[in-house]
Amino acid sequence: MSSTTSTAAGAAAGTDTIVDLRGMWIGLVVLNVFYLIVRIYEQIYGWRAGLDSFAPEFQTYWLSILWTEIPLELVSGIALAGYLWKTRDRNVDAVAPREEMRRLVVLVQWLTVYGIAIYWGASFFTEQDGTWHMTVIRDTDFTPSHIIEFYMSYPIYSVIAVGAFFYAKTRIPYFAHGYSLAFLIVAIGPFMIIPNVGLNEWGHTFWFMEELFVAPLHWGFVFFGWMALGVFGVVLQILGRIHALIGKEGVALLA
């Protein structure tokens, strides 16, 4: 009997861990390995099948990705938001301090994965796109670089932003009431790069500026991309809540 009791107690303690980073590490590994595979695919088929949009191989190796990723990302974003809303805490104001602390740690993990996803999309693949267009004369708006950058990496980090926002909104008391301006900026700002893509491609039909990547037409990418810095405001809000949860005694122990 005592053995059974101790086993149950150990299991309860295991599920009561405040800092469990396994979810974050799994997310980071999956994300980075996926993008490394994508980059290798680009290297191989960008030159072999990505230079002529009228060629059959372009349809096979590139447009097939485009027609698959767009609905998949849309469904994933809606499904994630729906799941987080459906499983929301119906009595979030009554959550225990220890559980709230655990949820804050989970939120930080969401934001970490989001930050890495933004790096891949708004930095790595975006800079790569500039290099591509300074090297290759395109005959379509749906270049291999764009199919990966605009229609894969941007929606992926936007889906993660949806997850982070809905997680905070449905499970953490501090964010459940009202809306955090910093959180709205960090979630919506980088997403707005996607509508900006429409303006960008429209502009390219009138002005040739592949070699002028700093042209005003491209400023929207920078403006909305830098809104990701709103994450510092969210982190300050999280730290303020942690300070309130651990109290003066906890702060003194950490000082």
Residue ranges and their predicted role:
Residues 112-178:
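Membrane-proximal helix-loop-helix units in multi-pass membrane proteins
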Residues 180-255:
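C-terminal transmembrane-bundle signature of multipass membrane proteins
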Residues 2-31, 97-112, 170-185, 240:
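Alpha-helical transmembrane segments and their helix-start/interface "positive-inside/aromatic belt" motifs
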